[in-house]
Amino acid sequence: MIYPYKGKTPQIAASAFIADYVTITGDVVIGEETSIWFNTVIRGDVAPTVIGNRVNIQDNSILHQSPNNPLIIEDGVTVGHQVILHSAIVRKNALIGMGSIILDRAEIGEGAFIGAGSLVPPGKKIPPNTLALGRPAKVVRELTEDDIREMERIRREYVEKGQYYKALQQQRTSCADKKELP
């Protein structure tokens, strides 16, 4: 469901895929070829949420903000299943592992990898191209070429899947308009 909030309506690129049972409210911008997967909630009712191009926000994630602290997700970011992002900045091509929590004013550097289940506390800065793990998250090493290739593969896969599902949605809508279901 897409809901306006106090005069702000989500702006979603035509090429973005928004799965069924996603809720998006208020001051939210979603870029080209971005995919938002099932049961995700993106609330822009406190401050803006800006999501770049070719981002994937996987199932059951929650995105929100604190007053005067927007949530910014740059191009090419992967957000794993059941992630909580709250008033953070996630730089280009980063990957946030499943079940992680990224809190207010944290900044995830370009190409950084946050391991599954990690907690990045308020204000913490994770350097570019590093792997951070734990609760609280600590940098454990620089990323390898294999890590970087795998992150790129995941990004490409989610863009392709998103476009596939987008085409299915359009086909379903077209059939429903004609009162024909496949």
From Swiss-Prot:
Molecular function GO labels: lyase activity; metal ion binding
Listed result of changing residue 58 to A: Retains 20% of wild-type activity
Effect of residue 56 to A: Retains 65% of wild-type activity
Record key words, sorted: Lyase, Magnesium, Metal-binding, Zinc
Domain of life, source organism: Bacteria
Thermal dependence, as annotated: Highly thermostable. Is active at high temperatures (60 and 80 degrees Celsius).
Cofactor: how bound: Either Mg(2+) or Zn(2+) can occupy the active site.
InterPro entries noted in UniProt: Hexapep, LbH_gamma_CA-like, Transf_Hexapept/Carb_Anhydrase, Trimer_LpxA-like_sf
EC numbers for this chain: 4.2.1.1
Catalysed transformations (reactions): hydrogencarbonate + H(+) = CO2 + H2O
Cofactor annotation: Mg(2+); Zn(2+)
Broad class of enzyme this protein falls into: lyase
Residue numbers binding Mg(2+): 64, 81, 86
Entry function: Reversible hydration of carbon dioxide.
Oligomer status and interactors: Homotrimer.
PANTHER family: DYNACTIN SUBUNIT P25, GAMMA CARBONIC ANHYDRASE-LIKE 1, MITOCHONDRIAL-RELATED
Family: Belongs to the gamma-class carbonic anhydrase family.
Protein name (Swiss-Prot/TrEMBL): Carbonic anhydrase
Source organism: Geobacillus kaustophilus (strain HTA426)
